[in-house]
Amino acid sequence: MASKRRNMSCSERHQKLVDENYCKKLHVQALKNINSQIRNRMVQNENDNRVERKQFLRLLQNEQFELDMEEAIQKAEENKRLKELLLKQEEKLAMELAKLKHESLKDEKMRQQVRENSIELRELEKKLKAAYMNKERAAQIAEKDAIKYEQMKRDAEIAKTMMEEHKRIIKEENAAEDKRNKVKAQYYLDLEKQLEEQEKKKQEAYEQLLKEKLMIDEIVRKIYEEDRLEKQQKLEKMNAMRRYIEEFQKEQALWRKKKREEMEEENRKIIEFANMQQQREEDRMAKVQENEEKRLQLQNALTQKLEEMLRQREDLEQVQQELYQEEQAEIYKRKLKEEAEKKLRKQKEMKQDFEEQMALKELVLQAAKEEEENFRKTMLAKFAEDDRIELMNAQKQRMKQLEHRRAVEKLIEERRQQFLADKQQELEEWQLQQRRQGFINAIIEEERLKLLKEHATNLLGYLPKGVFKKEDDIDLLGEEFRKVYQQRSEICEDK
């Protein structure tokens, strides 16, 4: 504020100087105007007033020169003063900055010392380090589980690929088998067709034979009718022909029987082939069903193994969480017990210190009283000895004793005042120590909150108990952190 006021004063002085210069310039301008008017008049009266004009012009020039010199001197002085003022302000600003920097370094050094010597901050740092270790351990466990899961996933994919490859091979084999069956069926169809054509040809040959027989019968009849005379010869010939026909019929019957047996054998083979194909199809279906059952069993085994591994991992995590909670609860109980013992011990020490201080105070007061009494007696005796009270009359003796008593009381009062001053100084030193301790406690609290703000968000879910001293610590870290922390706390309580 003072610097601002000084800056305003400097600005006002500068403005005042500018105004003065402006007035001087106006004055100079007025003089110049007058000079111009005079010059005009002198032009009119040049012949009459030439000498006076030269003198007046010289006077004006001298005055103008003096004004210019004065203005230049004032400007130089003002600039010098402004430079000195600016230099002083810069020096003062540099001193203030150095002081602020020194105070900042001093405060930082004190905070560093407090951080190094504070048991609470060291405990908090240990807890945060433990939380980071827990987080790292959880990350390693999660990474191992992820690797196991990826391995199981790869195994499942490999098994799935093998099953698909097996299915594809079975499908290709079935397709090849179907193709072979179709080829065989087509072959048997072609064979049956050929047999039918052969049978048809045989039937045509038989019909042709019958036609020839009819023709022969017709010829025989004609011969019988035309030549009865040669009946005997032709009859023999006819008998021979009949025998030939009978033999031909017998051979044809044998051929038909043979063909029928061949057809029956062929049909039997076809039936056997069909039965064999049916048996193969049944075997193939049984093999496919068996492979499908094996695949389902393998898939179920993999699923059960995966579920078992997941269940074991969950059980392991639950056991680890329970062990961690039990360990943290044990640490918290032990810490509470230690804090209670420490508090009780501190109370006992404070009580003992108070009793010792009271006893010491009593001793000091008693000693002070005894010392005052001894001092009073000594001083009275000394004064009595010095003034030889026995040589004085009673009135002077009483006056002298009263004077001695007053002097002794004055000395006692001075000693009492000195004692009170010493106690007041001790009280002030104790209050100063308390204020210093309060400042240190404030620094510890600030550093504790700073550590929490810096690390608590990254360690959410891994912070041990006892990190937060009060509910306000959680609220300082933000609404989102508080909600997630409460949810995790509820989950841990439910477990």
Curated annotation (Swiss-Prot):
Region ranges (Interaction with BBOF1): 1-314
Organism: Macaca fascicularis (Crab-eating macaque)
Protein known as: Meiosis-specific nuclear structural protein 1
Primary subcellular site in the record, as a coarse category: nucleus
Membership in a protein family: Belongs to the MNS1 family.
Localization (cell): Nucleus; Cytoplasm, Cytoskeleton, Cilium axoneme; Cytoplasm, Cytoskeleton, Flagellum axoneme
Gene Ontology BP terms: cilium organization; flagellated sperm motility; meiotic cell cycle
Annotated InterPro entries: MNS1, TPH_dom
Pfam families in UniProt: TPH
GO cellular component terms, A-Z: axonemal A tubule inner sheath; axonemal microtubule; axoneme; nucleus; sperm flagellum
Role description: Microtubule inner protein (MIP) part of the dynein-decorated doublet microtubules (DMTs) in cilia axoneme, which is required for motile cilia beating. May play a role in the control of meiotic division and germ cell differentiation through regulation of pairing and recombination during meiosis. Required for sperm flagella assembly. May play a role in the assembly and function of the outer dynein arm-docking complex (ODA-DC). ODA-DC mediates outer dynein arms (ODA) binding onto the axonemal doublet microtubules.
Subunit note: Able to form oligomers. Microtubule inner protein component of sperm flagellar doublet microtubules. Interacts with ODAD1. Interacts with BBOF1.
Entry-annotated residues carrying Phosphotyrosine: 188
Primary gene name: MNS1
Coiled coil: 59-410
Highest taxon above the source species: Eukaryota
Keyword terms, alphabetized: Cell projection, Cilium, Coiled coil, Cytoplasm, Cytoskeleton, Flagellum, Meiosis, Nucleus, Phosphoprotein
